[in-house]
Design a protein with these regions (language model features):
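Membrane-proximal helical "anchor" segments flanking the first transmembrane region
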Residues: 246-248
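Conserved, non-catalytic sequence blocks in retroelement Pol enzymes and Pol-derived host proteins
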Residues: 241
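Glycosyltransferase specificity loop/lid
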Residues: 3-235, 244, 254, 261, ...
Length: 513
């Protein structure tokens, strides 16, 4: 795999850049006051990076959290907490219940009702805050300079509008879908919907698929989120206010991706890209782990983690993975919380937790087996480690698909995984492995100049829009096709009814005669 035909060294700096932007948004005399309404779970990991950086620059940060928060601690040297005595709705048990189904479709269906409940509880949390006069008086007297929120839930948006303070997003996903589709022009003719698993180069029927997936997803988002937030916004701001318009009015969108990851697409001036901002150089490993890694010799190590939500796998799948690992000369570090697989080889170490970033940055790491979460994807990009993806839910399938298109990942479907399929994917990536080294800014400029010379251009950075006729760009042909299908179906239905009626009338006439 040729690593970083698309790697951009700016990923080393975005954390500092983003904090600078936030700093410019806040009066700098004695440091600003930031009210944070985060999303619990893995999203808190990258929000915490920004919070710690803001604190280090002298800003005062307050974090709103539910009393049963899964990740967000009540006490911290970097922020003060505003704890609301109400369940937040998302916990580890909720996601583990979802793991009983091991196909993406069935798992999505199991989680749909759960997310409906999560957003209901977020709205209850906001109502409890706004109805607490003493709390709101204290918040107003604090005179926060801005609200920083993850718009995967709408609590921070409503709070910022209620307090009439600037709103900044730490964003990839919103309650209305992927962030770009809420704020920026997104022609469906060449901008793929994440759930469609397509690229920016689509055939006619792929564009039909993209169009249909968009319609279905918008319907599902409105069914899952809409009832709660529409009622909440109507209650406090009036029925004429649309909750999505409050999202679109955000001052700044700090997008947790960049064009290393994204396909070329339109954007907006207030969208700031910070893909990989949470990435950092590797720290030394604990002694026992370092000894295990060093024992791999010239073959190196493979690390596997399916994130915080999926700690264990069904026994049959775990056994197939273990067999495939046992056949390799590499050592394997596998984050796994289930029963020890019966087929586990001597080259595989099971751990409850691993310093993932530090392992990815180790010079002996050869491969990352991952579920495809955004944080892990960017850490792998940052450390130039190729990926074998086992995506299951949320944006994981799309994330891995994007990396596959760029030539740095292989995708394996858990629903069809066996030892042969998994072993083949591992071997293909290991055989093609090539690791680049980090570059200084001048080296980056020279790299891209030479890249364009070597490849006679940089076509992967240009959008497909200029190649498309106007009717394709605006999806006119797709809409005409779908309209034709609908009309044909309707005419066929009318024809069948008419035929049935004519036959009935004919029989009645024959009886009368």
């Amino acid at each position: 795999i040729t690593w970083l035909n698309f790697k951009v060294v700016k990923m080393c700096l975005p954390g500092i850049f983003i904090v600078t932007l936030l700093t410019l948004s806040i009066p700098a005399v004695h440091g600003g006051k930031v009210l944070v309404f985060p999303q619990d779970g893995s999203h808190w990991v990258n929000m915490k990076v920004i919070i710690e950086a803001l604190h280090s620059r002298g800003h005062s940060v307050s974090v709103v959290r539910p009393s049963d928060s899964w990740y967000i601690k009540e006490t911290s040297p970097h922020y003060s907490s505003i704890t609301i005595d109400i369940p937040g709705g998302a916990d580890e048990e909720f996601f583990q219940r979802g793991n009983s189904a091991w196909t993406r479709f069935s798992l999505d269906m199991e989680l749909k009702d759960g997310f409906f409940e999560i957003h209901r509880k977020v709205c209850e949390m906001i109502i409890k805050m706004l109805e607490n006069k003493q709390l709101m008086q204290s918040i107003r007297e604090t005179k926060y300079d801005l609200v920083l929120t993850d718009p995967l839930n709408g609590g921070g948006v409503v709070l910022a509008h209620y307090l009439n303070v600037p709103l900044v997003f730490n964003v990839r996903w919103t309650i209305g879908g992927e962030g770009h589709f809420v704020i920026a022009p997104s022609p469906l003719s060449y901008v793929p919907i994440p759930a469609a698993e397509l690229t920016d180069k689509m055939s006619f029927f792929q564009r039909v698929r993209n169009f249909l997936v968009y319609i279905i997803r918008q319907y599902l988002y409105r069914q899952t989120m809409g009832p709660h937030y529409s009622a909440l916004v109507s209650r406090y701001f009036g029925p004429e206010v649309d909750y999505l318009s409050l999202f679109q009015a955000a001052d700044l969108w700090l997008m947790r991706v960049d064009f290393v990851f994204e396909f070329p697409r339109p954007t907006m001036p207030n969208v700031i890209y910070m893909g990989g901002f949470q990435c950092k150089p590797a720290k030394p490993l604990p002694q026992e782990l370092e000894e295990f890694v060093q024992s791999s010799g010239v073959h190196g190590v493979i690390i596997m983690s399916l994130g915080t939500l999926i700690g264990q796998l069904p026994h049959d799948i775990a056994d197939e993975i273990a067999v495939a690992f046992a056949q390799l000369p590499q050592k394997v570090i596998w984050r796994y919380k289930g029963d020890r697989p019966a087929t586990l080889g001597n080259n595989t170490l099971l751990v409850d937790w691993m310093p993932q970033n530090d392992l990815l940055g180790h010079p002996k790491t050869r491969l990352f087996v991952a579920h495809g979460g955004t944080n892990g994807i960017f850490e792998a990009i940052y450390h130039s480690v190729p990926i074998v993806g086992l995506p299951l839910v949320f944006d994981q399938t799309d994330n891995i698909s994007r990396m596959k298109v760029k030539g740095v990942a292989k995708v394996v479907d858990l629903a069809t995984l066996d030892r042969n399929i998994f072993s083949q994917a591992l071997q293909e990536v290991l055989d093609e492995l090539h690791k680049d080294v980090p570059m200084e800014p001048l080296d980056t400029a020279l790299f891209w100049i030479e890249f364009v010379m070597r490849h006679k251009g940089a076509a992967h950075l240009r959008t497909e829009s200029y190649r498309m006729p106007w009717y394709s760009y605006h999806s006119v042909d797709v809409m005409v096709f779908l309209l034709t299908v609908v009309l044909f179906t309707l005419l066929a239905f009318i024809g069948i009814i008419r035929c049935f009626c004519c036959r009935s009338c004919l029989k009645m006439k024959m009886k009368e005669e």
